[in-house]
C-alpha cells in the first residue's frame, strides 16, 4: 500500500481542522508546524494499524518528496537549500531479515537518496536489483525535468550543475 498525502504545502494548514492547529496561527512557522504535527498523527495511525497485522509481513517506509525552507520571511520548496532536499526517512519492519537488510543499506549513510530507497524497496519485494549506494545522488532544481539544473552530491560534497 502506498499513501501519498498533501502534507506540508502552502498555504500551510489551510486543510486542517481547528483542533489540528495545536501551535496556533500567529505566524508562518506555527502554521507549518501544525502540518508537521498532523503528519505525525497520520504516521502514528498507519503504524498502529500495521502492528495489528497478525503475520508481521510488512515494511513501513516514510519519506517526503521534498523538504521546505521555512523562515518567518521566506518559505519555499524546490531550492538547493538543504532544508529543501534533506528529508526524513523512516523504515521499520517486524521481520528481522528486512531489518538487517535495511540496516546494512542505510546505517552507514550520512545521507540516503531516494534512488537508494527505491532500489531497496524493489529488492525487498524480491526483484533482482542491487540496492544503490549512498555515496552519490542528485537533487533536481525547482523544475523536476532538470531544466533548471541539479545539485549533484558525491561523498558529501555538493556541486550545482547548470543545464547546457
Where on the chain are the PLM-derived regions?
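Catalytic domains that recognize anionic headgroups
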Residues: 1-164
Amino acid at each position: 500500500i502506498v499513501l501519498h498525502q498533501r502534507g506540508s504545502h502552502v498555504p500551510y494548514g489551510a486543510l486542517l481542522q481547528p483542533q489540528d492547529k495545536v501551535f496556533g496561527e500567529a505566524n508562518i512557522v506555527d502554521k507549518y508546524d501544525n502540518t508537521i504535527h498532523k503528519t505525525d498523527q497520520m504516521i502514528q495511525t498507519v503504524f498502529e494499524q500495521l502492528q495489528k497485522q497478525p503475520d508481521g509481513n510488512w515494511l513501513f517506509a516514510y519519506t517526503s518528496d521534498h523538504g521546505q525552507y521555512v523562515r518567518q520571511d521566506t518559505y519555499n520548496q524546490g531550492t538547493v537549500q538543504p532544508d529543501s532536499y534533506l528529508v526524513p526517512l523512516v523504515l521499520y519492519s517486524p521481520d528481522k531479515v528486512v531489518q538487517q537488510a535495511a540496516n546494512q543499506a542505510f546505517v552507514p549513510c550520512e545521507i540516503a537518496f531516494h534512488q537508494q530507497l527505491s532500489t531497496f524497496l524493489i529488492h525487498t519485494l524480491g526483484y533482482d536489483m542491487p540496492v544503490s549506494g549512498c555515496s552519490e545522488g542528485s537533487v533536481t532544481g525547482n523544475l523536476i525535468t532538470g531544466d533548471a539544473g541539479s545539485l549533484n552530491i558525491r561523498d558529501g560534497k555538493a556541486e550545482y550543475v547548470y543545464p547546457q
